[in-house]
Structures are given as structure tokens and as C-alpha cells.
């Protein structure tokens, strides 16, 4: 479940027309959300409040190892943020759950721009650790982000600086961190057809190519990776499909994933990992099932039927729908001359309207009239996306498994009487007394039980006003 402060941050990006989906950091977010979702490992309680239109705060309490907690505070000068940030009772569940990313090509930036900022701070106790973030929009396509992690115990503090650029063609990130003087550069380029092809099947696809390069100045250790993402929709059903391919040449790791949304409430994902140096591989599967209330489903069905009835209703007030050509003579006027041969010139003159050009001007009039009875037809992609947005989901069940780890991850997230509840567990065949990291030789020596046993379990409860 997305925490309240993270939810406010994403709404801030949405208000300021900043698209986080088109960044290299989130290029594999769809498969990560379906396979590597976070499972609570303790009892966690979060209470959040919007004290003023520009300030938000959260109090967190958990029993992870010992009783600990945190206090968060967020301030922003964005005037419209209080209108779109909703409490836990009214917020749609899709906005608080990391799920499938439905990317749409041809995005545009906002017409108006105003430099806005966001301040965030979080104090952890009893460790006395301070986490802070400062975000400042510089231009309509760039922003500056400063993150820091400070400790009162005298340990070294970490300061990270981001310069980010977000444009319709892609994104760029320049990162510098005081931790080992790390310097990095990330970019993502979108190869989409553009807005001129939105009506065609090719206009619903997006191909993104990106890479990242890192260098530790203090130890001169390099790092790099590249990734490819292809997002498209089925031409007959409009179901979104996402394929990714990533490569880390230094470590020899290759990863590919395939994700598809079969219906508004069903998603499936598979991922294959392979290492060219160690010849090790792994196959992972994940799925999620969304549940909607019966009343919401019935309301959406009734609205769809009503819209169809209104669209197919024929406006009788328009004379074009009567099928007659204006200016043409009536049948009673030409009845006496009906027996004339068709090759007689008088026959054609009587059949013509009063104006010789009237029939030519209106020859196409009866043909488009049936089409005018219906509104412009939406594509199957737009219909599928509208169906997802109109559905009011109440809960979601996530499951993932890995052949190499031989585990089963379960997570249930939903709304219950104004509370956002997230409960999950990880079941594995590794004994509890075994170390968390074991190689293949040690894994063969450690006996594995026949049945899965819980390795992690937790519940998270969030409430916001």
C-alpha cells in the first residue's frame, strides 16, 4: 500500500504536469509492482491528516523488533493540491496501490506554469534519524530534488542531488551523492508515433529505450545498465500489454518480462532472469485480482446502457433523417406521367427537383444521415481505459512465485470502513534456522520441508482525514 506522504507527492507531480512513468527509474515498474511487491513484516499503524490546504502530517507506529515509529511533515505552495488529495474513505483504491501502469502515448505539457516547491521531513525514533526532501520546479520541463539522510548518533550523513528533465520525447536525470561521491546519468527516450496517429492502432503503442551510467569517484567503480520497454494494446479488445528487456553488461544479467491486463480486474506477469557468467536462471510469475462492489458494478452497467440509448435515439426534428431530397416533386405531382418511357426527356425533367442543382448538392445527404445518429465511435483502447476508471474497486489480491526461490508471496489490500488495510505473508520451503543468503552448495545440504512455512507476515493499517 502506498503511504500517505508518497501519495501526496504523486498528486503534487500530477498537479504540476510531471509524469513519473516516463523515466528510466520506473521503466520496469509494472513487473516490479506485480512480482516484487512489498509485504509488511510487522504490525504497522499510520494516522495522517491534512491540517491546512498546504500542510500534511503523518504519525506512524510499528512493532518491528522493538516499538518504533516516525513523524512526518509535508509543506507545499501548490494551491490545487488540497482539491485532489482525498482521505482514506473517499480515495479510489487504484491511487493507493502500486499496480499495472497503463501508459498512453502523445502526452502534452500543461499550458500554464508556475514555479512550485515541496518540503518533506520525517523523524524516526528511537534512532533519531532525520529524512528530508526538497523539490523545486524550475521550468515546465525540469525540476531540482534534494534528499538527505541525517543521523544524530554521529554517523556519516548522506546527501543526494537530482536534476531531472521530463519532456514528451523522454527524460534525463543527473544524480550526485555524497556516499562514495557517486555520480550518475540516466536517460529515457520515447519512440512513439505521436498525436497525429492516435486514431490508428499504431498510435496506441510506445517504445521506450533508456540507459544509466554510474561512477564512484572515490573508488573509481563504474556501473551501467540499459533497458527497453514496449507498451501496446490488443487491436480487437484494447487490453494493455507491456514487454521489457533489461541488460547489465558488467554483471552479465539479462531480464525480460511480459505483463498483460486481461480485464479491468485481472492482471498477469511473467519474468525470466538469466546470467551469462554463472549460467543461472530464474522464472517468476505474478498476478493480481481486483474486486469491485456489486452496487458500483450495477451503477456502471446502467450508465453504459443509458448512454447507448441516448446515442441511438434519432432526432426527428432534423429533416435530413426523413430520407427525402429537399426540392423534389411529390409522387402525386408525377403520377399522371408515370407511364412515360424512361428514354423520354420529359420523364427526366419531371423527376428532377425544382432546381437542377439541388439534387446534385444533396446527393450525399441521405448517406451520412444514419451515421449522424451516433456519436463518434471510441476506440477499443479508450473503452477499456474508461471501464477501468469507472470501476470502483474495494480490494485486490496479489500473488507471486519464483522457481528458484520456491516461495509464494501473498498480499491483500483493500478498504474497510474508511481504513486502508494491507495484509500479506511470504511462504517458503527454506527452514527458519537457515541463513537468509545461501549458495547452491549450502542449499543442497540444508534439508527443505515438503510444506511451505511462513517466513514473513505483517499487517498495515492506514487512516487519513
Curated annotation (Swiss-Prot):
<dbReference type="GO" id="GO:0051654">
    <property type="term" value="P:establishment of mitochondrion localization"/>
</dbReference>
<keyword id="KW-0496">Mitochondrion</keyword>
<comment type="subunit">
    <text>Component of the ER-mitochondria encounter structure (ERMES) or MDM complex, composed of MMM1, MDM10, MDM12 and MDM34. Associates with the mitochondrial outer membrane sorting assembly machinery SAM(core) complex.</text>
</comment>
<dbReference type="GO" id="GO:0015914">
    <property type="term" value="P:phospholipid transport"/>
</dbReference>
<keyword id="KW-0472">Membrane</keyword>
<keyword id="KW-1134">Transmembrane beta strand</keyword>
<keyword id="KW-1000">Mitochondrion outer membrane</keyword>
<dbReference type="GO" id="GO:0000002">
    <property type="term" value="P:mitochondrial genome maintenance"/>
</dbReference>
<dbReference type="InterPro" id="IPR027539">
    <property type="entry name" value="Mdm10"/>
</dbReference>
<dbReference type="GO" id="GO:0007031">
    <property type="term" value="P:peroxisome organization"/>
</dbReference>
<comment type="function">
    <text>Component of the ERMES/MDM complex, which serves as a molecular tether to connect the endoplasmic reticulum and mitochondria. Components of this complex are involved in the control of mitochondrial shape and protein biogenesis and may function in phospholipid exchange. MDM10 is involved in the late assembly steps of the general translocase of the mitochondrial outer membrane (TOM complex). Functions in the TOM40-specific route of the assembly of outer membrane beta-barrel proteins, including the association of TOM40 with the receptor TOM22 and small TOM proteins.</text>
</comment>
<protein>
    <recommendedName>
        <fullName>Mitochondrial distribution and morphology protein 10</fullName>
    </recommendedName>
</protein>
<dbReference type="GO" id="GO:1990456">
    <property type="term" value="P:mitochondrion-endoplasmic reticulum membrane tethering"/>
</dbReference>
<dbReference type="Pfam" id="PF12519">
    <property type="entry name" value="MDM10"/>
</dbReference>
<comment type="similarity">
    <text>Belongs to the MDM10 family.</text>
</comment>
<dbReference type="GO" id="GO:0001401">
    <property type="term" value="C:SAM complex"/>
</dbReference>
<dbReference type="GO" id="GO:0045040">
    <property type="term" value="P:protein insertion into mitochondrial outer membrane"/>
</dbReference>
<keyword id="KW-0812">Transmembrane</keyword>
<dbReference type="GO" id="GO:0032865">
    <property type="term" value="C:ERMES complex"/>
</dbReference>
<dbReference type="GO" id="GO:0070096">
    <property type="term" value="P:mitochondrial outer membrane translocase complex assembly"/>
</dbReference>
